Amino acid sequence: NEVQYSYEYLFKNILGNNSKNNNLRLWTQNEIKDDVYINYQNLLNDDGFKIFLKKLYNLGFCVITNCETKLETVEIIANKIGYVRQSIFGGLWEFESNEDMADSAYTQEELRPHTDSTYSNDAPGLQLLLCCDYKASGGESIMVDGYNIGKTMKNNNKDLFDILSNIDVPGKYIGDGVILEAKRPIFKLDKKELVQVSFNNYDRSEFRIEEKATNKFYEAIKKFDELANSDKFQWRHVLKPGELLIFNNWRILHGRGSFKGKRKMAGCYVNMEDFRSACKIHGVN
């Protein structure tokens, strides 16, 4: 058999730079403003949906405005990307503050920036959060570019970056009839390229590391947490009813300011492989 390939194809797929992160836009707070917003109606046509995917791929998150404040809206958006992922919390979910739940998201307290499901071997790729009702004060949603934290630490604290790239950190969830455990580095690398950030002090489990590495590990954790909680790296916004926040859980750390009052949310997860598939189908890379 004989197969012919164009030079352009060979260069792009074999000879060229195949970095997964070539077109990502790493950001700090003062570098993104209105870039993150897109109207829900724009998602309903192919051109608008591609623009949405580009925002989500490049920045790691975006806010969809003018959504209907019902659970079905979350499902419609998830199904345009892939499908709703089932988890211990169900597929689609609605929630208000609830102290009886084991998960920290159900409280009114401040949530420091973290990624979800560090206790899962395959953490959700995307998370969708729709604000259905807000009669409260506070409760800002917080986004942090974990890839940019990785780049910053690699450039300025290479020894600490290496620690967080090589030590597996365990996560554990106990509740709702399950015990889930998994472990991976905070900075997961593939051929020296950062492909996933996993950081959650709420779900981190006990573990042992070599005594000589203990102090350095906690120094690295402290530096990561300092950067994630500095104003420079945080984008903050109080979600209004009808606004849906969607973000890449393998890249973006999310948090929430403390609040008082009523705040009702709806949401779901989508698998990373389905997000990547949608991007490839629409030529987003």
Region annotations inferred by a language model:
Residues N1-L24:
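Hydrophobic, ordered structural segments
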Residues L24-F61, N66-N285:
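Active-site environment of non-heme Fe oxygenases that use a 2-His-1-carboxylate facial triad
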